[in-house]
């Protein structure tokens, strides 16, 4: 038996046209998918992409395909689905590492990323470091040295959008329009990591969130920006292919109850009725 876990993401710190194609930097948070791989017959309610990952690994290490029928995958996750929280990446990445360990192998981050994108567009939560990642083909993987400490008040909406559906939206002109802002945002992410400055990271995320309004607009976005300003928060980040929003803050410095009260006053809770206070964590899949 082997158990692994991978964090969710609160949308992306940045996503857009950077270095010649659409890329992203995920925002890993302390909400995990935990996957147990053991010997046994498959569960009836298993997640199809997790099974696809097991089959992909058997193929990768040249095991007979029928071995899959003796491998049980048990995914335990409460990460919201189809809202931009990287629930699917967490499931398949944790499945990959648990399966590899179960079969007596190891997977490095680069191989893991390659296997994940072979199944679907992938979040950079699969890397320990904050990483600029080409989520479609894994061709770019630029890691930042370290990351500032911060918390996120994650605003959850009832709205859902499958990543695959987002990728069908014509968005080339919107991506090009935001390219200059995203270049600045990527520079700020790197500066924030070097200087350990959460405000700089917030500036990067806010730039990217604003550019994303051309592609997948969030409701009452100006009210969100005003709240960030009024409460002196670090910034706001969004799911660029989902509905979730993150208010970037420090729970020891900022009054979270007051921020929640302000959300209600500005009627923002109409769009985001659920809130979760979470730490930003290091990414990567951990064996348990």
What annotation goes with each model-predicted range?
Residues 74-76, 92-104, 187, 226-231:
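Long, contiguous secondary-structure blocks with strong helical propensity
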Residues 1-83, 283:
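ATP-binding N-lobe of GHMP and related small-molecule kinases
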Residues 235-239:
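Short beta-strand
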Residues 56, 60, 98-105, 118:
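Active-site catalytic microenvironments for nucleophilic, acid-base chemistry
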Residues 83-109, 125:
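DPxDG-like acidic metal-binding loop motif
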Residues 244-249:
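Short beta-strand->loop micro-motif that forms the acidic, two-metal-ion catalytic signature
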Residues 108-234, 250-264, 268-288:
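ATP-dependent small-molecule kinase catalytic core of the GHMP/sugar-kinase superfamily
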């Amino acid at each position: 038996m082997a158990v692994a876990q991978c964090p969710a993401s609160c949308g992306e710190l940045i996503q857009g046209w950077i270095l010649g194609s659409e890329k992203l930097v995920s925002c890993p948070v302390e909400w995990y998918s935990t996957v147990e791989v053991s010997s046994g017959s498959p569960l009836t309610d298993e997640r199809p992409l997790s099974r696809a990952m097991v089959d992909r690994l058997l193929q990768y290490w040249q095991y007979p395909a029928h071995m899959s029928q003796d491998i049980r995958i048990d995914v335990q996750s409460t990460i919201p689905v189809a809202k931009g929280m990287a629930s699917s990446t967490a499931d398949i990445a944790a499945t990959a590492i648990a399966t590899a360990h179960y079969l007596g192998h190891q997977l490095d981050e680069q191989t893991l990323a390659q296997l994940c994108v072979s199944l679907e567009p992938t979040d950079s939560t699969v890397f320990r470091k904050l990483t600029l990642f080409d989520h479609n083909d894994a061709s770019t993987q630029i890691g930042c040295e370290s990351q500032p400490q911060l918390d996120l008040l994650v605003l959850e909406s009832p709205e859902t959008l499958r990543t695959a559906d987002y990728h069908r939206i014509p968005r080339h002109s919107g991506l090009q329009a935001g390219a200059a802002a995203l270049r600045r945002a990527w520079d700020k992410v790197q500066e924030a990591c070097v200087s350990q400055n959460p405000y700089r990271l917030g500036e990067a995320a806010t730039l990217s969130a604003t550019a994303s309004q051309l592609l997948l607009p969030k409701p009452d976005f100006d009210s969100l920006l005003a709240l960030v300003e009024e409460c002196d928060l670090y910034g706001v980040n969004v799911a660029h292919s989902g509905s979730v929003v993150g208010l970037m803050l420090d729970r020891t410095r900022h009054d979270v109850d007051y921020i929640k009260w302000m959300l209600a006053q500005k009627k923002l809770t109409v769009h985001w009725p659920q809130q979760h206070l979470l730490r930003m964590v290091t990414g990567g899949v951990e064996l348990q």
